[in-house]
């Protein structure tokens, strides 16, 4: 059987049309930034936008769906960045073809339709295909062998090959618990001339057998013990990589040889002045322009954190590869126009935002080019001596001074067979962070020269203390006196002020004598046992040797103690609820709240948070005494006291018992757990790979938080005219009504535009044998413009048509030319003629093109000129 050649555009359309004919609703691609999953950095599969449906928290007006989803894998768990350009199939950005069943059809239809599409529509040779099933999934195996007719030797059972029950390449789980089930993957055999073995064999990682389609059957619900039970409404989730399928259908072995990439690679070669179209750097650039442009379209701007930093890394990696090819001036942003030509029809948002995308990438490119050449000189110099490892401090300098992301430096070094000292890089990074933290403190701590005796901390028992001034500092320099209006540092021989340590902030308060009043804004350690009180002398004069009264701010200290004590209880509760793997990774305790970072690899569920709150508040209600004891480190260990991994402890430590918690701690705490009053979690999220952060409030702040929530609920109830207890149902009903109205509105717009289209056909003017029509459709969107265009072309037979829609100042344009007329008039030329007059530009195919503009006032004149323009060209 000869396999026909399909373009990427053909593959998309054929896939969607096939499943639409099978009763599936065609759903648009969701943005690369997930709207329903804050735990996920980027959309990395087609099912992401349906996750809430699978979890039962959302219901759609359809039970069958199909989509072509834009995806990104760069950063976090799914990171293909370093492989892009060097393999045949790795991408940062890719498109995923998918179809879904939400409690409707199941394995039989899913597998049979997949086989039908691949062999009867795409015309793939059946003898080139094989499938895998989960070893225990006899149903799928029988469908393949007995109903579809795939020979048993080409249906491979894959068992638990990942070290545990249900841990298998052919058993899919959404998370550690919840919906899961077996999957069946379809592979394409490229032939014996390609190295590699079938799936499940020792040589399965070769390139001969390539997975093209995965059919996931979510039929079970897994509990925390790993037991599964059937779901009441099994679902289907399938995914097929568009680029992989295109390579097969276009008879090439690499994804980078398909038509879409061929065009982008040639564009990259044009902009970099390169003639070798096989150069891996061109593949990198072609891949990265897709990723970065779509990220900008979805609102991700290059920055130094989060998604923005991933965007910056991708942009700068592309720029570096252009630089490697000899391009020493900005070029990358110029590829946006080529990308729009290739993908603008399928994804109108990149055409609509073409100017903005280009501008964002241009600014980032210009910024990096300012330092790129100098950074490369430093890198070249460091590697000139034949060293096999780039020092970590050099890698950090490139990162810190010249904007080289570490993976970019790794990229350069990998090409030269050189390793990067990443541990040294991490050390330099931490040193900079420590320096930055220190610079953010008041200029008073370890930079101050103090040679006197240690001070005595009395703040565990006293909040007011008579003390003597033993040192004063202004602007970091020792002084004998401090005068009114001056800011400085006061050191006392004894102090009730707690100096920042162990995550607890330093105390505030006052130091005074007679008319002199010094307001303490912060307390920091000058040495381990010497505390510096930073602040401002509001009145009078303070001298070294003066006897003063030191008074801690009672309200702030009490609130801070509540939050510190509850942190211990929360730490214990976290370990009880989540497991003993929970370890403290950082904390901040002040008067407003407690912030606690801990090791855990998954978001906390609402039920887990509620259980943590229950456990902690039970300890609060028990109102047990807090007990602190000093003992040697060995004795403390024997008591079972919690010690923080990586923390350095002295020979004598302070063991704190609060409720059922026992930890080593030098902080200040409440006398009884009941003093905490109330505990409420207010936030939970991820801060790094494997690290979560939880924030909570206590006492008056917890009460204020709950009162604020209550006020919000009351306002919402008043707005919806419903009692608070009925809010959830009322909101759900309102959302359902909105969805229904939106659907009805879309249908009405379509009908209105369609009826306008029927009327407009009579307005067409014959120009030298071609019916010419230029008109505005009220209330139409891009989809309606295209649909109306198709109807008018069918009706007018031989025609050149321009349709426009207006939304505020924005103009959307569609141009269409019938097949028998494209030799005389091109839709792209026609749409750009009109677009240029309304402040825009566009493009497309000879028979259909789209454009946008920003000057709606100029539209009537532009449309009026179409007839003359067509007449001149034919």
UniProtKB/Swiss-Prot annotation:
It is found in: Cytoplasm. One of its GO terms (biological process) is alanyl-tRNA aminoacylation. It comes from the Bacteria. Keywords: Aminoacyl-tRNA synthetase, ATP-binding, Cytoplasm, Ligase, Metal-binding, Nucleotide-binding, Protein biosynthesis, RNA-binding, tRNA-binding, Zinc. It catalyses: tRNA(Ala) + L-alanine + ATP = L-alanyl-tRNA(Ala) + AMP + diphosphate. Catalyzes the attachment of alanine to tRNA(Ala) in a two-step reaction: alanine is first activated by ATP to form Ala-AMP and then transferred to the acceptor end of tRNA(Ala). Also edits incorrectly charged Ser-tRNA(Ala) and Gly-tRNA(Ala) via its editing domain. Belongs to the class-II aminoacyl-tRNA synthetase family. PANTHER family: ALANINE--TRNA LIGASE, CYTOPLASMIC, ALANYL-TRNA SYNTHETASE. This is Alanine--tRNA ligase. The gene is alaS.
């Amino acid at each position: 059987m000869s396999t026909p050649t399909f373009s990427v555009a053909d593959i998309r359309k054929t896939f969607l049309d096939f499943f639409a004919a099978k009763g599936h609703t065609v759903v648009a691609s969701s943005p690369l930034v997930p709207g329903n999953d804050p735990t996920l950095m980027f959309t990395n599969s087609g099912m992401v936008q349906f996750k809430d449906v699978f979890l039962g928290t959302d219901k759609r007006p359809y039970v069958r769906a199909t989509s072509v989803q834009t995806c990104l894998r760069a950063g976090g768990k799914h990171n293909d960045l370093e492989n892009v350009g060097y393999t045949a199939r790795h991408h940062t950005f890719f498109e995923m073809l998918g179809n879904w069943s939400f409690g409707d059809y199941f394995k039989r239809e899913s597998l049979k339709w997949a086989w039908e599409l691949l062999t009867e529509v795409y015309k793939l040779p059946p003898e080139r295909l094989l499938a895998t099933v989960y070893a225990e999934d006899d149903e799928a195996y029988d469908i393949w062998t007995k109903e579809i007719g795939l020979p048993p030797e080409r249906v491979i059972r894959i068992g638990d090959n990942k070290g545990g029950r249900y841990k298998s390449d052919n058993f899919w789980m959404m998370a550690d618990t919840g919906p899961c089930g077996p999957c069946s993957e379809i592979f394409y055999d490229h032939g014996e001339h390609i190295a590699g073995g079938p799936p499940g064999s020792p040589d399965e990682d070769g390139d001969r057998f390539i997975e093209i389609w995965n059919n996931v059957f979510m039929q079970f619900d897994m509990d925390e013990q790993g037991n599964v039970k059937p779901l009441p409404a099994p679902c289907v989730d399938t995914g097929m990589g568009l680029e992989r399928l295109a390579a097969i259908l276009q008879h090439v072995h690499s994804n980078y040889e398909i038509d879409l990439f061929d065009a982008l690679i040639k564009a990259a070669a044009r902009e970099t002045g390169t003639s070798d179209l096989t150069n891996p750097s061109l593949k990198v650039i072609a891949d990265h322009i897709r990723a970065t442009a779509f990220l900008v379209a979805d609102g991700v701007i290059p920055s130094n954190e989060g998604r923005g930093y991933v965007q910056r890394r991708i942009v700068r990696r592309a720029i570096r590869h252009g630089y490697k090819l000899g391009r020493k001036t900005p070029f990358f942003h110029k590829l946006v126009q080529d990308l729009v030509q290739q993908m603008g029809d399928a994804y109108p948002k990149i055409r609509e935002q073409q100017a903005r995308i280009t501008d964002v990438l241009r600014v980032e490119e210009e910024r990096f080019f300012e330092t790129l050449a100098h950074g490369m000189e430093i890198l070249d110099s460091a590697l000139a001596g034949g060293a096999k490892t780039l020092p970590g401090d050099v890698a950090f300098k490139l990162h810190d001074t010249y904007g080289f992301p570490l993976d970019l430096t790794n990229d350069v070094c990998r090409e030269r067979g050189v390793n990067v000292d990443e541990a040294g890089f991490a050390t330099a990074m931490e040193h900079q962070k420590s320096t930055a933290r220190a610079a953010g403190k008041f200029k008073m701590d370890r930079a101050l020269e103090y040679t006197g005796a240690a001070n005595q901390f009395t703040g565990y028992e006293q909040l007011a203390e008579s003390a003597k001034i033993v040192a004063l500092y202004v602007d970091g320099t020792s002084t004998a006196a401090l005068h009114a209006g001056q800011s400085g540092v006061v050191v006392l021989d004894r102090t009730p002020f707690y100096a920042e340590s162990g995550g607890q902030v330093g105390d505030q308060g006052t130091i005074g004598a007679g008319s002199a009043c010094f307001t303490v804004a912060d307390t920091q350690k000058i040495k381990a046992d010497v505390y510096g009180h930073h602040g401002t002398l509001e009145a009078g004069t303070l001298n070294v040797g003066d006897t003063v009264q030191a008074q801690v701010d009672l309200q702030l200290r009490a609130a801070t103690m509540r939050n510190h004590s509850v942190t211990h209880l929360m730490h214990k509760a976290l370990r009880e609820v989540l497991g003993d793997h929970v370890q403290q990774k950082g904390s901040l305790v002040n008067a407003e709240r407690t912030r606690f970072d801990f090791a855990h690899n998954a978001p906390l569920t609402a039920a887990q948070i509620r259980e943590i709150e229950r456990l902690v508040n039970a300890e609060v209600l028990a109102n047990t005494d807090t007990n602190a004891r000093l003992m040697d480190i060995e004795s403390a260990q024997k008591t079972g006291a919690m010690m923080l991994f990586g923390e350095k402890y002295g020979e004598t430590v302070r063991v704190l018992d609060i409720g059922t918690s026992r930890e080593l701690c030098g902080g200040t705490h409440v006398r009884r757990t009941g003093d905490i009053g109330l505990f409420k979690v207010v936030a939970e999220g991820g801060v790094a790979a494997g690290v979560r952060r939880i924030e909570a409030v206590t006492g008056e702040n917890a009460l204020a938080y709950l009162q604020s929530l209550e006020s919000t609920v009351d306002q919402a109830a008043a707005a919806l005219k419903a009692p608070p207890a009925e809010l959830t149902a009322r909101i759900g009903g309102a959302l359902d009504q909105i969805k229904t109205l939106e659907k009805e509105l879309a249908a009405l717009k379509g009908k209105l535009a369609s009826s306008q289209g029927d009327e407009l056909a009579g307005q067409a003017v014959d120009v030298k044998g071609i019916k010419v029509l230029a008109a505005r459709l009220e209330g139409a969107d891009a989809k309606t413009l295209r649909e109306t265009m198709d109807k008018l072309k069918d009706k007018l037979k031989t025609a050149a048509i321009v349709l426009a829609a207006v939304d505020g100042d924005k103009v959307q344009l569609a141009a269409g030319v019938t097949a028998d007329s494209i030799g005389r008039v091109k839709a792209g030329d026609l749409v750009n003629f009109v677009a240029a007059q309304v402040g825009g530009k566009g493009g497309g195919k000879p028979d259909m093109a789209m454009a946008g503009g920003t000057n709606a006032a100029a539209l009537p004149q532009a449309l009026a000129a179409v007839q003359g323009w067509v007449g001149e060209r034919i």
